[in-house]
Structures are given as structure tokens and as C-alpha cells.
From Swiss-Prot:
The organism's taxonomic lineage, starting at the top: Bacteria, Pseudomonadati, Pseudomonadota, Alphaproteobacteria, Caulobacterales
Assembly: Homotetramer, a dimer of dimers. One homotetramer interacts with 1 SecA dimer.
UniProt name for this protein: Protein-export protein SecB
A single cellular component GO annotation: cytoplasm
Keywords of the record: Chaperone, Cytoplasm, Protein transport, Translocation, Transport
One BP term from GO: protein transport
Database matches in Gene3D superfamilies: SecB-like (3.10.420.10)
Main location group: cytoplasm
Cell compartments where the protein resides: Cytoplasm
Function: One of the proteins required for the normal export of preproteins out of the cell cytoplasm. It is a molecular chaperone that binds to a subset of precursor proteins, maintaining them in a translocation-competent state. It also specifically binds to its receptor SecA.
Family affiliation: Belongs to the SecB family.
Amino acid sequence: MTDTTAAPPAAPEDGAPGETGIRIIAQFVRDFSFESPHAPDSLRAGGAPPAIDMGVEMNARGRPDGLFEVDLKLSARATRDEQPVFHVEVLYGGLFHIAGVPEGDLEPVLLIECPRFLFPYARRLISDVTTEGGFPPFLIDPIDFAGVYAARKAQAEGVVVGNA
């Protein structure tokens, strides 16, 4: 029995024929804020848990170099008895190389698949900052980016979808 390892396949060069897929070139925090206007009083134990209003936005734009910038904005506003407890907002960006995707399929890739890559990192930032702010970790449930995309698309076309 031998311990041999096969060499990993060579990565295709940019623009190589037949190349398909999404490649993350960079990811970064574009903007980040946390407010706890009534601390330390808002940190008191007991009372009703805060009501949390979540917001999700996705945007994408092409760049002259052929890459795409995708932004995922997550915001959470917590209130208790109509008083603000905390407000956190992160605008997390990614720079993507996308190859082999037909023009008609590009928008869903940019606004569904790319945010799926960015979400875990933006979610962790929010969890970490709420913990550092003295609150229990705020873990955002997984987001159905395809559902958000479909609802926004329908809304833009004037179709009523649920309570969107």
C-alpha cells in the first residue's frame, strides 16, 4: 500500500474555452454599523424578548474589467415596548468572475447565487457585533434568495405577491 496523492487538476486560465462557473475574486465589508441607543438599560434581563425586523437587499453591477460587484445588505432592528434595543446593518460585498452563463441567466446568478456565497460572512458579522454589544448572539435564519429575488421581480412587474 502506498501513500500517493494525485496532483490537483490545473485551474483553467481566465477566459479559457469551456470555462463555466462562479469564482469569488474578493469579498469585503463595504459598510457596517451597530447602534444600541439605550444601553446599558436595554441589556437588562427579563421582560419580553425584543421584536426584530429584518431587511435584505441584493444589488449587482458589472465592471469595465468584466467582473461583477455584488452587494448583500442585511439589517436588523430590535425593539422592546416600542423602544429601540439595537440596530445593526452590514453591507457586504463580493467581486465575482462569472463564466459560461448565458446572458439571460446572468441576473439570477448575480442576485441569487452570489448572495448565497456572501451570506454566511455577513451573518457572522451581525452575530459577533450583537454579542459584543452585550446581547445574546443574533443568528439570522438562512435566507431563500431565490424567493426574495422572485418576490422583488414580481413586485417590479406590478404583480402582488403575498405581503411583500
